[in-house]
Amino acid sequence: MGTETATLGGGCFWCTEAAMEELAGVTDVTSGYAGGDTADPSYRDVCSGTTGHAEVVQVEYDTAELAYEDVLEVFFTVHDPTTVDREGPDVGSQYRSIVLPHDDQQHERATAFVDELAAADAFDGSIVTEIEPLETFYPAAEKHQNYFEKNPDAAYCTVNVAPKVSKVREQFGARTE
C-alpha cells in the first residue's frame, strides 16, 4: 500500500509530535508550521502570532498499518478541539486546532470524521477545528524535532507532553509501539 502523510495542528507541536510517535505504523513525525502567509517562518515569527501559521506536525504513516482515520482518532483524543486558539496553557492562533489535508480525499475524510464526532456529541463543546487544504509545510528548526524524546524532564514536557503520551498508551495500547 505505501505511506501517506497527514498534517495536523493541535496546540504545541511538541505534544502532538510525541503523541503521534507512539503509534505503530507511524514512520516519521516532523514538527513545523503551516496554514499561514509568511514564507519560511522561524519559531519566533510564528510565536509572534503575525504569520498566520499554526504549529503543526506532519505524520508519515504506513497505510498497511494505519488509516488516515486512525491518525485523526489519536489527534482528536490528545487535544481539545473545542477551544479557539488554545491548547492547555498555550494561547494564540498558532495553537489552533487545524487539519491540513493533502488532497481532496483527505479533505472529505477529515470532514466526515469531524461530522461524526459532532453528531456523536463526542465533546462538551462545539468542534472548532479548521479543515484547510495544505499549501506549504515549513519544518521547524532541528531543536524542535523529537523535543520530548530529547527533553523528557523539562518542566513543560512533564506537565503537558507526558500526560498526552500516557493517554495514547492507555487508550491505544494495542496500536502503540
Curated annotation (Swiss-Prot):
Disulfide bonds: none annotated. Keywords: Oxidoreductase. Signal peptide: none annotated. Its EC number is 1.8.4.11. It catalyses: L-methionyl-[protein] + [thioredoxin]-disulfide + H2O = L-methionyl-(S)-S-oxide-[protein] + [thioredoxin]-dithiol; [thioredoxin]-disulfide + L-methionine + H2O = L-methionine (S)-S-oxide + [thioredoxin]-dithiol. One of its GO terms (biological process) is protein modification process. Coiled coil: none annotated. SUPFAM superfamilies: Peptide methionine sulfoxide reductase. The active site is at C12. InterPro entries: Met_Sox_Rdtase_MsrA_dom, Met_Sox_Rdtase_MsrA_sf. The keyword Cytoplasm does not apply. One of its GO terms (molecular function) is L-methionine:thioredoxin-disulfide S-oxidoreductase activity. PANTHER family: PEPTIDE METHIONINE SULFOXIDE REDUCTASE, PEPTIDE METHIONINE SULFOXIDE REDUCTASE MSRA 2. Has an important function as a repair enzyme for proteins that have been inactivated by oxidation. Catalyzes the reversible oxidation-reduction of methionine sulfoxide in proteins to methionine. NCBIfam families: msrA (TIGR00401). Belongs to the MsrA Met sulfoxide reductase family. This is Peptide methionine sulfoxide reductase MsrA. The gene is msrA.
